[in-house]
């Protein structure tokens, strides 16, 4: 009694497995619906209605600001990505019906993740470090320590380590050794320094003496003009010999003198004019 129902159940499963209908095999751009193979909607379109025995798959284009990038059976389109400038993003390429908007970081920043949802400023290489790889929109700056013989004295996202200055090539001597943050300090040799300083000092002294002499000469000329003004031009005095006239000769005029026996200057031309009148 118990074995009969079990045997019936076993044979029922066996017959069902043997006579089951094979699964519907659809193409790459199709999908199965009720034993039918319906066409997928192309990129840029969404599914409205599945196909039937009498109609094909019904699709509709995505709206403005939407897209679908693959063959699909989606009921809704995806919205274009928004490039938020407050997060350091800008649009690299506008989205279409079948492509999404592409965002990149603004100049001087890079993505914080592989999805580039936000950006952050490039790192600076501190003094003592140089830029090994300049940052891009996706990757940050890569820094490396300056090796022996090189230095970097700035914080920069672009500057590499610079080689120490060669004092020997410039004909100088090294006065201070360079570090990874400072360059070598070069200077003149002691003898060379003397040869340079002496001519420069003599040139400066000569210039000072020349200027002093010029100033002294100009001062003397001004003082001489102030003490000896130009004498006024005087009329010539006619000299008359008394022996040229007959008769008694009058006594010679007495010349007046001032204190300290200085003669009084006669007024120009009077005596000569009187003598001429008497002669006439």
Curated annotation (Swiss-Prot):
Q: Where exactly are the transmembrane stretches of this chain? A: 195-215
**Carbohydrate attachment sites?**
153, 180
Residue numbers spanned by region Disordered: 225-252
Could you give the subunit structure recorded for this chain? Monomer and homodimer. Interacts with TRAF1, TRAF2, TRAF3, TRAF5 and TRAF6. Interacts with TRAF6 and MAP3K8; the interaction is required for ERK activation.
Q: What name is this protein filed under?
A: Tumor necrosis factor receptor superfamily member 5
PANTHER family, alphabetically?
A: TUMOR NECROSIS FACTOR RECEPTOR SUPERFAMILY MEMBER 5
GO function term, MF aspect, one:
signaling receptor activity
Q: Which first-to-last residue range defines the signal peptide?
A: 1-20
Cysteines paired by S-S bonds: 26-37, 38-51, 41-59, 62-77, 83-103, 105-119, 111-116, 125-143
Q: From which organism does this entry originate?
A: Bos taurus (Bovine)
In this chain the TNFR-Cys repeats are located at 25-60, 61-103, 104-144, 145-187
What does the UniProt record say this protein does? Receptor for TNFSF5/CD40LG. Transduces TRAF6- and MAP3K8-mediated signals that activate ERK in macrophages and B cells, leading to induction of immunoglobulin secretion.
Main localization (coarse): membrane
Q: Which GO terms describe its cellular component?
A: CD40 receptor complex; external side of plasma membrane
Ranges in the Cytoplasmic compartment?
216-280
Q: Which UniProt keywords apply?
A: Disulfide bond, Glycoprotein, Immunity, Membrane, Receptor, Repeat, Signal, Transmembrane, Transmembrane helix
CDD domains, per database record: TNFRSF5
What Gene3D superfamilies would the database entry show? Answer: Tumor Necrosis Factor Receptor, subunit A, domain 2 (2.10.50.10)
Q: How does it sit in the membrane?
A: Single-pass type I membrane protein
């Amino acid at each position: 009694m118990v074995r009969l129902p079990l045997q019936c159940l076993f044979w029922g499963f066996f017959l069902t497995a043997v006579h089951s209908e094979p699964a519907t095999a659809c193409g790459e751009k199709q999908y199965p619906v009720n034993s039918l193979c319906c066409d997928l909607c192309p990129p840029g379109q969404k599914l409205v209605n599945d196909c039937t025995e009498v109609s094909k798959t019904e699709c509709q284009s995505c709206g403005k600001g939407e897209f679908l990038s693959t063959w699909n059976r989606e009921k809704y389109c995806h919205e274009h990505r928004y490039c938020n400038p407050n997060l350091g993003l800008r649009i690299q390429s506008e989205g279409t019906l079948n492509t999404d908007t592409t965002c990149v970081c603004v100049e001087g920043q890079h993505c914080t993740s592989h999805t580039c949802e936000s950006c952050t400023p490039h790192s600076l290489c501190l003094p003592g470090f140089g830029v090994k790889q300049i940052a891009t929109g996706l990757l940050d700056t890569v820094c490396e320590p300056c090796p022996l013989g090189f230095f970097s004295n700035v914080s920069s996202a672009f500057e590499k380590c610079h080689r120490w200055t060669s004092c020997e090539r410039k004909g100088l001597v090294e006065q201070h050794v360079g570090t990874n943050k400072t360059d070598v300090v070069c200077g003149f040799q002691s003898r060379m320094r003397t040869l340079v300083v002496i001519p420069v000092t003599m040139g400066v002294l000569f210039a000072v003496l020349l200027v002093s002499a010029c100033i002294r000469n100009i001062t003397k000329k001004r003082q001489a003009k102030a003490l000896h003004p130009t004498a006024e031009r005087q009329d010539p005095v006619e000299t008359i010999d008394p022996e040229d006239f007959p008769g008694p000769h009058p006594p010679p005029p007495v010349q007046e003198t001032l204190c300290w026996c200085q003669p009084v200057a006669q007024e120009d031309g009077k005596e000569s004019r009187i003598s001429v009148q008497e002669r006439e």
